[in-house]
């Protein structure tokens, strides 16, 4: 019995990467009865029938799982936003951060297209960078030509996703990383049957000793399962101060003696971050129940 990680799922086959090789596997027949649906990123136990084919025997417990894209065991999410074209939006950045924080995935903020920004825009980005770094987030900026080495350092030994709205440079980032992999991944690409005209599915690409989920469509934000009372845990600087609130169930909205509001007034929490917290809180409270 071998252990490996699913790096692609297509037409009922699961492509499992183990010790430098890729095996085309099917799931055991009883998976459906046990309500087990393997995902790309799953760690699995499998047995091989020959040099290239095998059967998945069991799926290990997951650290986390995203719905769209359907991928499991993500260690890190590189959230790509452009400085300009489209302009950097703290509102959008905070919404992506909430979506990633709620899955207990480490976010890294990448701000692209800095070479296209004016001096005043660069100064404003620098202010935002300082604020997010003070919260505890890693932030790096890139020009039109991405800093591949910096990105590889983040990905090393991990499974990562790259997310962001359309037009911010996700494809440029992936393609620049992928260009270095032609020789290294030739064998894997052949095993997976990757071609120019194949339908795009979620797929883990090896980058150094890590993997990146090739998810071109990852630009939506999902928080259907997020409850109003748990939103505060997706804002680290709010979570850090909640213990100082007078009332145990404080939502940091209209309650008296709120340590979070006091921190906002003292400029210890960025006003825009608190504003976005309240906006999202109201959206969650006003959300219609789904049946």
Swiss-Prot record:
Its EC number is 3.6.1.-. GO terms for cellular component: cytoplasm. Pfam families: RsgA_GTPase, RsgA_N. It is an enzyme of class 3 (hydrolase). One of its GO terms (molecular function) is metal ion binding. Its cofactor is Zn(2+). This is Small ribosomal subunit biogenesis GTPase RsgA 2. It comes from Listeria monocytogenes serovar 1/2a (strain ATCC BAA-679 / EGD-e).
């Amino acid at each position: 019995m071998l252990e490996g990680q699913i790096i692609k799922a297509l037409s009922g086959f699961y492509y499992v990467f183990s010790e430098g090789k890729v095996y085309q596997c099917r799931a055991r027949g009883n998976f459906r009865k046990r309500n087990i649906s393997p995902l790309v990123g799953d760690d699995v136990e499998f047995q091989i029938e020959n040099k290239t084919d095998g059967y998945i025997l069991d799926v290990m417990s997951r650290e986390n799982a995203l719905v769209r894209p359907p991928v499991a065991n993500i260690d890190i999410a590189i959230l790509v936003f452009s400085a300009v074209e489209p302009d950097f939006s703290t509102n959008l950045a905070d919404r992506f951060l909430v979506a990633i924080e709620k899955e207990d995935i480490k976010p890294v903020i990448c701000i692209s297209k800095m070479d296209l920004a004016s001096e005043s825009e660069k100064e404003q980005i620098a202010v935002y960078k300082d604020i997010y770094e003070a919260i505890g987030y890693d932030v790096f900026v890139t020009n039109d030509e991405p800093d591949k080495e910096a990105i590889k350092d983040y990905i090393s030994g991990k499974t990562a996703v790259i997310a962001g709205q359309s037009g911010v440079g996700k494809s440029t980032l992936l393609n620049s990383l992928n260009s270095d992999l032609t020789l290294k991944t030739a064998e894997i690409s052949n095993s997976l049957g990757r071609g120019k005209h194949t339908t795009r599915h979620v797929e883990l690409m090896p980058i150094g000793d890590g993997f990146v989920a090739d998810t071109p469509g990852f630009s939506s934000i999902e928080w259907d399962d997020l409850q109003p009372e748990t939103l505060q845990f997706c804002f680290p600087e709010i979570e850090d101060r909640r213990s100082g609130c007078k009332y145990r169930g404080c939502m940091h909205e209209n309650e008296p003696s709120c340590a979070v509001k006091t921190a906002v007034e003292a400029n210890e929490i960025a006003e825009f971050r608190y504003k976005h917290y309240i906006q999202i809180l109201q959206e969650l409270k006003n959300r219609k129940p789904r049946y």
